[in-house]
Amino acid sequence: MAGREGGRRQRRTKRKVCTFCAEKSEAIDYKDINKLRKFVTERGKILPRRISGNCAKHQRELTRAIKRARNIALLPFTTE
């Protein structure tokens, strides 16, 4: 046991690229339900940046668009 180090190996994960920056899209449309659904879980929660890979600017815009779509009943707040 001498000489063994008890520790976890650190994995280098590839940094996710913001999909909105890659597409060079101007604004995130709250009426585009198919695009917004990719960033919402089955339970209706908004995916965090570290999972979705969005930059801070687009994550804020995405959150506003999802909340706006929920308020006008385009997206559900929760599932059944």
Curated annotation (Swiss-Prot):
GO terms for cellular component: cytosolic small ribosomal subunit. PROSITE patterns: RIBOSOMAL_S18. Disulfide bonds: none annotated. GO terms for molecular function: small ribosomal subunit rRNA binding; structural constituent of ribosome. Keywords: Ribonucleoprotein, Ribosomal protein, RNA-binding, rRNA-binding. GO terms for biological process: translation. The keyword Ribonucleoprotein applies. It holds the Pfam family Ribosomal_S18. SUPFAM superfamilies: Ribosomal protein S18. Binds as a heterodimer with protein bS6 to the central domain of the 16S rRNA, where it helps stabilize the platform of the 30S subunit. HAMAP family: Ribosomal_bS18. Part of the 30S ribosomal subunit. Forms a tight heterodimer with protein bS6. This is Small ribosomal subunit protein bS18. It comes from Clostridium botulinum (strain Hall / ATCC 3502 / NCTC 13319 / Type A). The lineage of its organism: Bacteria, Bacillati, Bacillota, Clostridia, Eubacteriales. The gene is rpsR.
